[in-house]
Amino acid sequence: MMRKLAAVTAAVTVLCMPVLRVSADVPEVSAKAFVLLDAQSGQVVCGDHAEEKRPMASTTKIMTVLLTLESGELDRPFTVDSEAIRTEGSSMGLQEGDTVTKRALCAGMLLPSGNDAANAAAVAVAGEQSAFLDMMNRRAAELGMTHTCFASPSGLDAEGHGASAHDMALLARAALRNDDFAEICKKQQMRVCFGNPPYLRTLTNTNKLLAMDDTVIGVKTGFTDAAGRCLVSAAERDGRRLICVTLSDRNDWADHEALYDYGFASAQPYPMPLPELPAVPVEGEDADSVQVYLKAPPVLTAWRGVPPAYEMTVLLPPFLTAPVRKGEPVGTLLVTNGRTVIAELPLCANVEIIQNDQEPIPQNMILRIIHAFFNVFFNYR
């Protein structure tokens, strides 16, 4: 089976890989490290020291919130752990004996950046903070965050705790795919219920970009003496989404605005050159073959000064069985950037083949086998 699959799937046209650089057009920023990332493809638009591990303060809470949201039972009330909420720094106002929900804790982390909320969430999800840190680091590895170590659920300074700007952009990209996360982090204010007994309170977001620019959709601020001002944000304009990360940046609000103006202005359509599409044999006494075609060629996004890094892979079964209808999807053109799938486009039959005497094998079953095989190599998160 492995040999068959290898024989009928054609990996084609690996294009230029991106070069991480700061060109003359990129705005000057105050950050010690920054990156601007295309959320669709994962491609770096620009950056500097983007792979350098640095403390990232409360932007850490992006991971804490994501894992909390994924743990389920978000609206079940429980009493906060009294030890966990005894912490320094910013707070959502939790007190011993308070009843809260995981959803309220997530709002408390993303808006007022509550360290008490982060610690309480870690214990609620994993039973103890050390177990939760293991979860954070496992998920970081899954996301390809190769320059990251989580040693604190809140982002308070801890030995070894840090991440690169690029890693934090990858994390934000994954988190924004969670609908609950995306809904909370874009709010300038939220009403949440907690306390002893619970009552409604208003939480205010520390992310001033949300008020400065209505195209900004999140994500998280951070500050400690060691980390300086840290900011992870995302913005959407004209159907495109960019993620910006600055670490140790005294002028972060203005720098993010300038980088977004640059990034969105440098976007341009990239009509991707198609690979040669083979014919697929049709099984039966009267052997024949079907040529495949793509109904609509992909038009992707390229960024000025950054070579495209897209790859295309043709996924086709070793044979087809009649009947084959003209225009019927019989394969897939897989568009990827590294291990990230950008698009799955149907490859269709260009002719009609009538049924022969043999019992047909469903085409979609063959395609499912091929897709399962390729799932091993590509990240569909």
Predicted feature descriptions by range:
Residues 145-146, 157-381:
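Domain-terminus/edge residues, biased toward the C-terminal soluble/receptor-binding domains
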Residues 6, 29-30, 52-53, 85, ...:
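Generic detector of short alpha-helix boundary/capping microenvironments
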Residues 2-23:
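Sec-dependent N-terminal signal peptides of Gram-positive bacterial secreted proteins and lipoproteins
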Residues 19-179:
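Active-site-adjacent loops and short helices of periplasmic peptidoglycan-processing enzymes
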